[in-house]
Amino acid sequence: MTHQIVTTQYGKVKGTTENGVHKWKGIPYAKPPVGQWRFKAPEPPEVWEDVLDATAYGSICPQPSDLLSLSYTELPRQSEDCLYVNVFAPDTPSKNLPVMVWIHGGAFYLGAGSEPLYDGSKLAAQGEVIVVTLNYRLGPFGFLHLSSFNEAYSDNLGLLDQAAALKWVRENISAFGGDPDNVTVFGESAGGMSIAALLAMPAAKGLFQKAIMESGASRTMTKEQAASTSAAFLQVLGINEGQLDKLHTVSAEDLLKAADQLRIAEKENIFQLFFQPALDPKTLPEEPEKAIAEGAASGIPLLIGTTRDEGYLFFTPDSDVHSQETLDAALEYLLGKPLAEKVADLYPRSLESQIHMMTDLLFWRPAVAYASAQSHYAPVWMYRFDWHPKKPPYNKAFHALELPFVFGNLDGLERMAKAEITDEVKQLSHTIQSAWITFAKTGNPSTEAVNWPAYHEETRETLILDSEITIENDPESEKRQKLFPSKGE
């Protein structure tokens, strides 16, 4: 495939070639979710006649703009017309390459597949793989669950968008040189949490063969929590539950403002995501971790892990230390009352404890639970990313720090952590990319350089990603045993 014009099911697309990589940006995978389609499940895109110019990214989905400067040098356009995929392919004439589909993070209300950090060029070139990045609806546009009030509306729209993008990949990626039967989904934070849900979702069944979950596992609201969140949102807008059609005429700005107001008002539970997937009989019938424990993702190999110091991204040295009541409520919300009482002594009231609580309970414990559940049905590999810069205040392996290494976009490391790009950094990036790519190709991340043993509940082998690669069995064993008491305790 030496030419950049490719024929998809919906029409022709024209991309560019740069540094040995073909790139197609801003290809629609669904109808724009605007007007009557706002808050509705995604529909396939319309067919187009001319060649579509796919040389620039599509708009990002609506989100608060105050944080965008952290990710972009130039602020991108925002629009509800945002359901686009981007495809990166090596410019060698090849067919049936493994496909890696990236699902970005951002707490379900921020982010885009077009962030510079997620440019798939280096990964595609290094690994002879096709990399696909995508946008999905965020915040109230993607995770305002309205089906309790009116059956015409679907819940979990952001997840349905991701499934629609995966369906587009299944139906079109062979035209770009990819193998539709060898698709790996990979994602971080809310992207990892999304994959936890996709593995349990009827709409995503059969659309991918392997999964990589970085710093994010199962995370859902109950149907009741979702309904009360939506009711509170409607109240801020002054719309009653019988007038949902009014939601179609509210401006995107006003929807974002209402979301912001609610997020500020609901701050009392410090560990609750305001927008997140919800349990719902049609789209997500069972809590993902429970579904996985019952074999919902049988036969899908899983690579999963966290960073050692996840929580340090979310607090600064002068962050508030929350009251004991707030911390107790958060523990109870995350663990249920009986277990919360048993582990309270792990987290005495201090800023450091708050940070550890976040690391352990939002990221590490769910990852261990998910890995354990899936290990009965498919091979699982577990990692912990320990590398960190030497200079304070960045001298921790904080949340998202592995991303520049995964994509090989190491300039992102300078931006995120003021870290120098040393030979050691380049080597670690190469090691991580090789493992991820090998997993996408074969379903096993072991390479010639690194023999990575699979994860078993008895031994809990964990690859430690640092300047030196090591293997630890059951890291932080004592804490893990407290957080997972055996049945009789």
UniProtKB/Swiss-Prot annotation:
Result, substituting G242S: In strain: NRRL B8079
EC numbers: 3.1.1.-
Consequence recorded when altering L463V: In strain: NRRL B8079
Top EC group: hydrolase
GO molecular function, one term: cholinesterase activity
Active site: S189, E310, H399
Modified residues (Phosphoserine): S189
Keyword field: Hydrolase, Phosphoprotein, Serine esterase
One Pfam assignment: COesterase
InterPro entries: AB_hydrolase_fold, CarbesteraseB, Carboxylesterase_B_AS, Carboxylesterase_B_CS, Cholinesterase, Type-B_Carboxylest/Lipase
Family to which this protein belongs: Belongs to the type-B carboxylesterase/lipase family.
Function: Catalyzes hydrolysis of several beta-lactam antibiotic PNB esters to the corresponding free acid and PNB alcohol.
Assembly, per entry: Monomer.
Protein name according to UniProt: Para-nitrobenzyl esterase
Species whose genome carries this gene: Bacillus subtilis (strain 168)
Gene that produces this protein: pnbA
